[in-house]
Amino acid sequence: MGSANCSKICGNKYENELNNHDTDETKPNINYIVINNKDSLNFKNYNNFAQKFESKLPQFGKYLDIYDFKQKIPENANNYMIQNFLNIPGSIPINKNTYEMKPIQFENGNIYSGNWNENLKMDGLGQYYIEEGNLFVEGIWNNGKLIYGRIFYANDNIYEGEIKNSTYHGKGKLLFNNGEIYEGDFRDGEIIGNGTFTFSDGTVYEGEIDKGKFKGHGKMRWISGIQYEGEFVGAILSNYGTLTDENGEKYEGNFYNNYFNGKGIYTYKDGTFYEGEFEFGLMHGKGIYNKKDEFIFEGDWANNMPHGFGKITFKDFIIKGVWRNGVNVEISEFEKGDEKNFDKKYLNFEVEAFNLIPHMLPNLEKIDNDIKGYGVGTTPTYLNSIE
């Protein structure tokens, strides 16, 4: 954290007072940097705290030169802190009646540089280096407990957010070394609640998450322009949802295991649509196919083809019959129009292939594998103060 400038923290009124007090009673101890409570600046209390602190110091550590502490800050943490200020939400309590000390190195090799309260607990803004694992923390402590901060891991992952009982808890952000980002809710060290995942290929998920898995309602956007909004089970599109692309094609209905399955409506970009039953991504069951400005077929379907009994409606004709694999094999009735004036070749047709194929969406399997490792995010217990 470095030495603080008293004119910035205490105000110019006290700058000369700190520099010119010569008596032993009032001259600040050289191991102090600044008292943070400018409204009750009292050098006697200042030195009383110094004496109490230094009488306890041998029990848990020793002073360390600020330069030596700076040498311990990992390069990834130092670079990130230079480029990004620590933004502390207004809801995070910060005790201003604290004292900023020189860095303290504990017996286990860990180092803390920052503020302490009258009870000799870490309190306020501080930085913490953990020897084991080369872990570095910058954050806010409250009476000895880390409650908000940034944790820099040796593998270049970074967490920034709220912390409770030494775990991610509340609002936070995880930046992974592969460029992926999660921002949202955490509970007891796990990704639980609502949040946003941004994957390295540009795919974005927003919605409900349970222990690192998409679970419940959410939205996903691919860089191709395809979007899905609906229910998820992991990275699987499940139950009810809507899938669209940038060209205007759209499916709205039921999904199962990344397939259209159950009842739904598929609309092509020209306005043609199929409304009815689907099975594993295909028109299968009862349904209506409305070929824009040409005809409407209502009846039985199998594997994206008319198959079974059906009725086809043209502008001047309505015909009932039987189809097999898309081919009319029997005409049972002309409800409208004269059979002599109708060319039967129009009874045989193929439907246009879907451009939206959910089980072939890019990186669904990769996304599922990626998020499996994002469930547990417990921070080390020794981030807390030495009692």
Residue map of PLM features:
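Intrinsically disordered, low-complexity repeat tracts enriched in Gly/Pro/Ser/Thr and acidic residues
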Residues: 1-387
